[in-house]
């Protein structure tokens, strides 16, 4: 964010972007907010930025940390079905980014989480040298037949990665 309603973007794949033009003049940027940005590139190497772009739309993305899954809290995270296309998951900017298809709620906000399964590893009795992550979704039994895409970016930078790869 530069100041006021003026902002720049640090893109996962495109580097730094300067919104030289926009189709969304009333967008209010929030410093540090991850967004999915639809844009058209205008210029390369523009005044210290990698690209100048025309922003067509910004979608704010939910950001979270990896949470620990245990026997005590497993029901809190739920295990309801949600559709994730493998082509709609990527790593960038220190985040695992996931776009998923969900049945929308009637009134209760759903919970989406990426959890580290410490319970399963402890139950097996030995550490296999891997971090076990699960994408969990809790509808709280509040769904409609109406579907929509959702997006979440989960920071993994606080995880201690195994040395065995």
Predicted regions and their residues:
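Structural detector for short beta-strands of small beta-barrel domains
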Residues: 1-3
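Extended, well-ordered protein cores
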Residues: 7-15
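Beta-strand/loop nucleic-acid-binding surfaces
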Residues: 14-26
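Short nucleic-acid-contacting surface segments enriched for D/E, G, S/T with interspersed K/R
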Residues: 24-36
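Surface-exposed beta-loop interaction hotspot
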Residues: 45-96, 101
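Short helix-loop boundary/capping segments
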Residues: 84-138
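An anionic, turn-rich surface loop/hairpin at beta-sheet edges
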Residues: 128-154
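Conserved small/polar residues in nucleotide/adenosyl-binding loops
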Residues: 157-163
């Amino acid at each position: 964010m530069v100041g006021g309603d003026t902002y720049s973007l640090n893109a996962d794949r495109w580097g730094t972007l300067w919104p030289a033009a926009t189709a969304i003049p009333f967008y209010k940027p929030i410093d540090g907010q991850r967004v999915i940005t639809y844009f058209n590139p205008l210029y390369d190497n523009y005044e210290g930025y990698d690209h100048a772009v025309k922003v067509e739309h910004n979608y704010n993305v939910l950001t979270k940390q990896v949470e620990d899954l245990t026997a005590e809290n497993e029901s809190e995270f739920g295990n309801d079905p949600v559709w994730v296309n493998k082509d709609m998951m990527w790593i960038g900017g220190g985040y695992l980014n996931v776009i998923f298809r969900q049945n929308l709620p009637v009134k209760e906000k759903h919970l989406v989480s990426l959890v580290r399964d410490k319970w399963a590893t402890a139950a097996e009795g030995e550490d296999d040298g891997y971090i076990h992550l699960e994408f969990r979704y809790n509808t709280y039994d509040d769904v409609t037949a109406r579907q929509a895409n959702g997006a979440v970016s989960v920071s993994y930078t606080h995880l201690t990665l195994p040395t065995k790869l």
